[in-house]
Amino acid sequence: MTRMYGGDVIDLGKGGEYGMVNPLEIIMDADENEIKTGLGYTVLNKTLQSLKAFMKYYAPDIEDDVLTLFSEVVQDTYARFGITFTSDFTQFTSNQFPTFSDVYVTVTSKLTSMTEKTHERDVMERLELKLRPFVRELQYYFNGHTSINTDSDFLVFNIKELMNSDANIRNALLFNVLKFAWGLCLNPNKNTVLSVDEAHVLLGAKNELGAEFLAQVQRRARKYNTGTIIITQQPSDFVADGILMHGKAIFDNSSYYLVMGLKKQAVEDLSMLIDLNDNEKEGIKRFSQGEALFVCGNRRMQINVIVTEDELESFGSGGGL
């Protein structure tokens, strides 16, 4: 479908030779009020928060002290590259940001200087173990400068190759791609649309930082003339403990909903996010292919989605028809 409409597919799930997104590259996400508090501070602080969310996807069991030290080590690494809370990030290019190799050097250098067996050294050793795969077996996914051509008006980031692989790696890669894609939508003078398929994957990891990031994207999109399309088959992941507040924010900041057929429990979960009466709940459980509940403001109607021959052709063999 992408190529039929003149777009580009980027197979990030296949590794660096197909395109790399550097998790340490900083995106310029700040509005006018935030700029008043100091652009560098706002942008770098958000970057550090998103990097901690990234690490939580990659290593859900990471201890709080290790995560805190990771943030400090990243700040030290940024400082070596002239990146501080007072930097003008509009002047940086992709090749000027550090990579995980540079973060790993910071960690190993600090370990070398720690001759005593202390708690700080223990935490640093645990951090080194978490980071080591980034410069070894996972380097083709996460270690390198961003190398993606973003000139196309229609970009699809494909991670299909990883959907059946280790869940933590997949989730970290998906979050990294989402953060990068959001960075492409931050020019208020250009209309853009950010579509996130399989959004439940991000929330299914019960990563509150990641859920908060997606909720912030949904809230802030209109400031940048960006439309968002959030697609999920599992509303249950939006109502999990610790996630519900962000799940509701994602739905509350939507202009309309298109609800297709769902099973009983999924309908009950969805009703925690949007108002559904009993008739609508029963209808959703019985919907067949193409039937949907369309909600736009106060208007609610059952519709039938009729696909055209051109649309069928664009789906290829992956349309499920």
List each language-model region with its residue ranges.
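Feature targets compositionally biased, intrinsically disordered low-complexity regions
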Residues: 18, 37, 315-319
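P-loop NTPase motor domains
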Residues: 1-8, 12-15, 22-226, 230, ...
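Short, acidic/turn-prone active-site loops that include or flank metal/cofactor-
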Residues: 14-17, 262-264
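C-terminal regions of RecA-like/P-loop NTPase motor modules
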Residues: 238-321
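C-terminal amphipathic alpha-helical interaction region
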Residues: 233-236
